């Protein structure tokens, strides 16, 4: 599976993911944020400038995100990404609203949208983990010039004995 396919699954199939950032005391904070776009240059999301999440992103522009889909454990696909983010202002805001029409209900006027700022996760690395197939499928990936760092163990499907 290509990195772009994985990012597309994260953005379109999972969409709402948990973001972890660090606060001003270096303590972890999490929140659920929708991924609005995915392309060859990374993942895009937005937040309002008055939120604590915005302040954390501006102060320490690194995130770790995780998302999953599936009805039960053996139908679950999980994707995690960690990397660097940057504000791109209102660039791509119109495209975000076009591709995510539910946003119009949340921010119905141009005036209400002035509070929003778009962020790009532009380089990072991550892992795709699929328990819907047995043995489980695991793949590391990277983008934006980052290198893949293998973590944990590696499952070699043809040598898997099914945890016996």
Give, region by region, the residue ranges found by the protein language model.
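Flexible glycine-rich active-site/ligand-binding loops centered on an Asp-His dyad
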Residues: 118, 133-151
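Ferredoxin-like iron-sulfur electron-transfer modules
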Residues: 144-164
């Amino acid at each position: 599976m290509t990195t772009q396919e994985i990012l597309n699954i994260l953005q379109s199939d999972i969409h709402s993911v948990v973001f972890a950032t660090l606060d001003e005391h270096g303590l972890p904070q999490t929140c659920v944020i929708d991924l609005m776009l995915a392309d060859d240059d990374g993942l895009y999301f937005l937040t309002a400038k008055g939120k604590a999440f915005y302040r954390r992103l501006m102060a320490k522009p690194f995130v770790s995100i995780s998302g999953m889909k599936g009805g039960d454990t053996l139908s679950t696909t999980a994707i995690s990404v960690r990397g660097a983010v940057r504000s791109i202002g209102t660039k791509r805001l119109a495209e975000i609203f076009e591709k995510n029409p539910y946003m119009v209900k949340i921010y119905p006027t141009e005036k209400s949208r002035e509070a929003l700022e778009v962020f790009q996760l532009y380089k990072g690395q991550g892992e795709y983990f699929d328990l819907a197939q047995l043995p489980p499928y695991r793949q590391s990936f990277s983008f934006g010039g980052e290198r893949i760092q293998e973590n944990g163990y590696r499952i070699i499907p043809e040598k898997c004995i099914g945890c016996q």
